[in-house]
Regions:
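N-proximal low-complexity "stem/linker" segments adjacent to membrane-targeting elements
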Residues: 1-29
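Short alpha-helix within the catalytic core of nucleotide-sugar-dependent glycosyltransferases
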Residues: 22-26, 50-54, 86, 99-111, ...
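A conserved acidic beta->alpha catalytic loop
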Residues: 27, 34, 42-51, 69-72
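Glycine-rich, basic loop-to-helix element that forms the pyrophosphate-binding segment
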Residues: 68-84
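Short aromatic/hydrophobic "clamp" motif used to bind/position activated sugar donors
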Residues: 89
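Donor-binding/catalytic cores of nucleotide-activated saccharide
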Residues: 94-214, 219-236
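Catalytic core of nucleotide-sugar-dependent glycosyltransferases
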Residues: 216-225, 231-259, 277-307
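Membrane-interface aromatic/basic loop that binds lipid-linked glycans or pyrophosphate carriers
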Residues: 283-361
C-alpha cells in the first residue's frame, strides 16, 4: 500500500489559545502527507479559539470540530479518539507546531517496519518574552548512533527503554505516531489525572512489541515562561511524584526488570531528581508554609523508604548533581534548606541557566 493511501488522524485539544492556534493548525494542514483528518476539540474556550476552529472547518473538508464543555485535555482527546478513522493517530497540542514532513516521514517508517509506535526527536523552545528564547534538542538514543532504530521484539525494547526514559522520549504524547487499532483493541485512553500524558504513554508501551525510533526532530513544543510562571508553587507535588515513582516501579516489574541494574539506576536517579524538585518547590514565593513547616516537609522527604532505596542506587552524571546528592545523603535538613534557597536564587536570577541545567541532568 502506498503511504498516500493511508489516512492519519490528528487530534488537537483546544482551550483559550487564540494567539497560537492558527500556526498550530496551519502546520498540520501544510503537511506533505495530505491524507489526514484533523479533529479540533474546543474544550469550552472563552476566547475566540472556538470560532477559529469553525472557520478552518468551513474551508477545509479534513477539519472536524467538536465543541464540548470544559472538562480537560484528557476528555477532549478521548472524545476525538472515538471518532478517529485513520490507520495511525497523532496527538498535537494547539499552542505548538510541527514541521511539514513529520507525518510523511514517520508514516514511511511505520509502514517499513510495521510499527505500532513511532517515536521521534523534538524541540523545546522556551520563551522568556516574544523575542528571547532558547531551543533545547531532545533526540532518542539509538544503537551505534544510527538515525533510525526498530525494535520488533518486546524484550529488546524493554531492556533498552531506560536509555530513552533518560532522554525524555516517553513523557509527552505528541512526538509519536500510534497505530489506532493498537489503542482501540486495548481500550487505551487518556486517564483522568493531574498529568494527562505520562500514564497514557506508559499504558501504550506496557505491552508493545514493535517500536521505531527516529532521531529526526519535527515537533516544536513552545514553553511560555514569564517570571511569575517560573515561581509558581505546585500543590501536592510530592504526592504526585510519589505516585509516578510507584507507576514506574510497577511497569518495570511487569516487564521483569525489577532487578535490572541499568533500569533500577535510571528509576532511582529519576526519583531523587524529583525529590530535589519537591524541596525547591517549597521555597518559591507562592509557598505559604512557615520555616518550621518547610523543615518538617524536607525531613519527610529525606526519610521516606523510597528515598532511602533510591539514593543508594542513583548515580548522577553531572558534577553539580553529585554535589547536591552528597548534601541529600547527609539527611541534614538545614543543609538541604540552604541548598534549596540557593537553587531558587539561581532560578530567579538566571532562568535560562536553570532551564539548561535542569534539562541536561
Amino acid at each position: 500500500m502506498l503511504s498516500n493511501d493511508i489516512k492519519i488522524s490528528i487530534i488537537m485539544p483546544v482551550y483559550n489559545v487564540a494567539e497560537y492556534l492558527p500556526k498550530a493548525i496551519d502546520s498540520v494542514l501544510n503537511q506533505s502527507h495530505k491524507n489526514i483528518e484533523l479533529f479540533l476539540v474546543d474544550d469550552g474556550s472563552t476566547d475566540s479559539s472556538g470560532m477559529i476552529c469553525d472557520e478552518y472547518a468551513s474551508k477545509n473538508l479534513c477539519v472536524n470540530v467538536i465543541h464540548q464543555k470544559n472538562s480537560g485535555a484528557h476528555n477532549a482527546r478521548n472524545n476525538a479518539l472515538k471518532l478517529a478513522s485513520g490507520e495511525y493517530v497523532c496527538f498535537f497540542d494547539s499552542d505548538d507546531y510541527v514541521d511539514s514532513n513529520m507525518i510523511k516521514d514517520m508514516l514511511e517508517l511505520a509502514i517499513k517496519y510495521n510499527s505500532d509506535l513511532v517515536i521521534s526527536g523534538f524541540y523545546i523552545n522556551t520563551y522568556y518574552n516574544s523575542n528571547d528564547y532558547i531551543t533545547l534538542n531532545y533526540i532518542p538514543y539509538t544503537t551505534n548512533d544510527s538515525t533510525v532504530e526498530n525494535f520488533n521484539n518486546k524484550n529488546d525494547f524493554r531492556m533498552n527503554s531506560y536509555l530513552n526514559f533518560d532522554r525524555n522520549m516517553f513523557y509527552p504524547p505528541w512526538n509519536k505516531m500510534y497505530r489506532l487499532s493498537y489503542l482501540k483493541e486495548r481500550n487505551i485512553t487518556f486517564p483522568i489525572t493531574y498529568r494527562d500524558d505520562f500514564p497514557f504513554v506508559l499504558s501504550v508501551i506496557k505491552d508493545i512489541e514493535n517500536v521505531t525510533y527516529t532521531k529526526n526532530q519535527y515537533y516544536h513544543f513552545l514553553r511560555k515562561r514569564s517570571d511569575s510562571e517560573t515561581q509558581k508553587f505546585v500543590e501536592n507535588l510530592y504526592e504526585k511524584r510519589e505516585e509516578e515513582h510507584i507507576e514506574m516501579l510497577s511497569l518495570f516489574s511487569y516487564w521483569g526488570l525489577q532487578n535490572d541494574k541499568n533500569s533500577i539506576e535510571m528509576i532511582s536517579r529519576r526519583y531523587i531528581d524529583r525529590v530535589i524538585e519537591c524541596i525547591v518547590n517549597l521555597f518559591n514565593k507562592e509557598c505559604k508554609l512557615s520555616s518550621n513547616e518547610k523543615e518538617s516537609m524536607i525531613y519527610k522527604y529525606l526519610n521516606n523508604d523510597n528515598f532511602n532505596k533510591c539514593i543508594k542506587n542513583a548515580n548522577p552524571k553531572k558534577l553539580y548533581l553529585k554535589i547536591i546528592y552528597s548534601i541529600l545523603k547527609t539527611k541534614n535538613v538545614y543543609l538541604c534548606y540552604i541548598m534549596a534557597k540557593f537553587i531558587n536564587f539561581v532560578k530567579k536570577k538566571n532562568i535560562k541557566l536553570f532551564s539548561v541545567l535542569k534539562t541536561n541532568r
